[in-house]
């Protein structure tokens, strides 16, 4: 009886500690460089595709749906098998799948930063540092963000649904942060919009979650085209 109680206490504490890791992984203070990217929003504003809060909300929903259809399969596949061989394979597939240089560079930049931070912060998971160190010298690894996010979540012991929901949360958070700095919506309006879009995001998650990398696809090719124009903007605040 005492052993069962002790086991329950240990499991409860482990679960609580995991929640702290989950929250830290989603905290905007984690220096992964997400603040430097607008997910194509800046280009959409300058090309007049987004010019009001209403346009912004529609744009964000399309971004979330495209992110879920294209990138959630890589998150899911990586967290299901969080090992170096699977990650390298998924990284290569995603590198061949991304169709514009701007989004590809943004993905590599954020992925590299996330892996560096995760290996330094979550020292209780030595495999993070081991996998990163073993891959740093390889010319065939691009360090794309989605597979690394899935790998980190898998090694931290996060469940599949929470990990995929977390990826969409990070996307929603960063796009709204960019919108605030681009003065399309204020901080209060962004918070209200985030809460409202969360309901739609859950529907998007249910539609696209638990798919293999081979099922990845784009649902909004126009977003991809617009983001690819980012490098041609005369003046810009964000890297993508």
Curated annotation (Swiss-Prot):
GO cellular component, one term: urease activator complex
Gene3D superfamilies for this protein: Urease accessory protein UreF
One Pfam family hit: UreF
Statement: the UniProt record of this protein carries the keyword ATP-binding: no
Molecular function GO terms recorded: nickel cation binding
GO biological process: protein maturation; urea catabolic process
Family: Belongs to the UreF family.
Name the UniProt record assigns to this protein: Urease accessory protein F
Organism name: Arabidopsis thaliana (Mouse-ear cress)
